Design a protein with these regions (language model features):
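The conserved SAM/SAH-binding core of class I Rossmann-like methyltransferase domains
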Residues: 4, 27-30, 99
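Helix-to-beta-strand junctions that scaffold the AdoMet/dcAdoMet cofactor pocket
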Residues: 21, 48, 90-92
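S-adenosyl-L-methionine
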Residues: 29-71
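C-terminal substrate-binding/active-site "lid" region of AdoMet-derived donor-dependent transferases
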Residues: 84-144
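Conserved SAM-binding loop of SAM-dependent methyltransferases across substrates and taxa
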Residues: 10-23
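Short glycine-centered segments of the SAM/dcSAM-binding site in methyltransferase folds
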Residues: 2, 25, 95
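Conserved class I S-adenosyl-L-methionine
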Residues: 2-9
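Active-site segment flanking the S-adenosylmethionine/decSAM binding pocket
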Residues: 53-98
Length: 150
């Protein structure tokens, strides 16, 4: 299956996708040039040069050169226009998953959930932190995740 990983960051989603099945391929799309080298280094570390393609730029200009995705993950930079663009190219039985940490992005995902349905989740992550000789849970970012299947 084909994954588009938009806002790929470190490439971890693309890497896990490729490791999940020997025929899976991924396209890691990232606007930030400083992250491209990190994705490429991680791709090499896992020996995925043949199945993980790294693209620098915006999905709006890159999409026309990519194969139709079976799944799309948006990890950053989500906008309403981007969601509509991605939904238009999804084939039958395809999946869209979006993570959001900012209030603005989270509000957008709530709106799209009400519009299209799917699944909406709030993921809370905490890490242990020492305090006064004891340990407490220190909350990290709350993540809202919307997933949608065609």
């Amino acid at each position: 299956e084909v994954l588009w990983d938009i806002g790929a960051g470190s490439g971890s989603i693309s890497i896990e996708w490729c490791l999940g099945h020997p025929k899976n391929v991924a396209f890691a799309i990232e606007r930030r040039r400083d992250r491209i080298s990190l994705i490429k280094a991680n791709r090499k570390k896992f020996g995925l040069q043949e199945r993980l393609t790294v693209k620098h730029g915006n999905i709006e200009t890159i999409a026309k050169d990519l194969p139709t995705p079976n799944a799309v993950f948006i990890g950053g930079g989500v906008t309403s226009d981007l969601i509509y663009q991605v939904i238009k190219v999804l084939g039958k039985n395809s999946r869209l998953v979006i993570n959001a940490v900012t209030l603005e992005s989270q509000a957008l995902l709530l709106k799209k959930y009400k519009q299209f349905g799917g699944n909406l989740k709030k993921i809370n992550i905490s890490k242990p932190k020492p305090i006064g000789g004891k340990t407490i849970w220190s909350a990290q970012y709350n993540i809202i995740q919307w997933s949608f299947k065609t």
